[in-house]
Regions:
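Hydrophobic ligand-binding cavity/cleft-lining segments
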Residues: 1-55, 166
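A conserved amphipathic terminal alpha-helix motif
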Residues: 2-5, 121-166
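Short structured motifs
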Residues: 7-8, 19-20, 59-61, 73-74, ...
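Short, P/G- and charge-enriched loop/turn segments at secondary-structure junctions
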Residues: 8-12, 63-64, 92-94
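Hydrophobic-ligand binding "helix-grip"
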Residues: 45, 49, 53-54, 68-115, ...
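Short aromatic-glycine motifs in intrinsically disordered, low-complexity regions
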Residues: 60-68
Length: 166
């Protein structure tokens, strides 16, 4: 059964009781990474294995995300700033104990690539907050795996160096 969550705004990413923050450097440039995050929403399961499906709303102002474990998020996009930031709030979910959740992806140039930063900001009942804090290392592992998969998806394979064996 889906429940409505507290309608927080972007500033919640800085003030939430629980904040999980992860970052990675990708070889692809910011416009390419941003396109995968914000435009090609349906491609998310191909690089973020915790996600079973991601479908944009008809008006483009939100999306529905289903996780592999059965959790469903109905989301509203809070920021869609090409090549720099993509953020959304969860409006309703079937996840127990959650009261508010916002996620923000920020992109910045890193040489020819992108520094990708993901903030998951949440609030909920005390057991939920504790569980999320304890899950932090696993969420970080999932993020690092997603960043690697996204990087492989966006970066074309290089031809072998002359004289190398393949």
């Amino acid at each position: 059964m889906a429940r409505r969550l507290r309608p927080v705004e972007l500033d919640f990413t800085a003030s939430a009781p629980v904040r999980l923050v992860f970052s990675a450097t990708l070889a692809a440039p910011p416009p390419t990474v941003y396109r995968s995050l914000a435009v090609e929403v349906g491609s998310m399961p191909s690089w973020f294995t915790a996600v079973a499906s991601a479908v944009p709303s008809a008006d483009g102002a939100g999306r529905t995300v289903r996780l592999r474990g059965g959790i469903v998020f109905e989301e509203t996009i809070l920021a869609a700033e090409p090549d720099t930031r993509y953020a959304y709030r969860v409006d309703s979910t079937n996840a127990p104990g959650m009261a508010a959740l916002t996620e923000e992806w920020t992109l910045s140039p890193a040489g020819r690539g992108t520094r990708l930063r993901w903030v998951m900001a949440a609030d909920g009942a005390p057991p939920f907050r504790l569980a999320l804090r304890l899950a932090g290392p696993g969420v970080g592992l999932s993020f690092r795996d997603a960043a690697r998969r996204l990087d492989r998806r966006l970066t074309p394979a290089r031809p072998p160096s002359p004289g190398s064996v393949r």
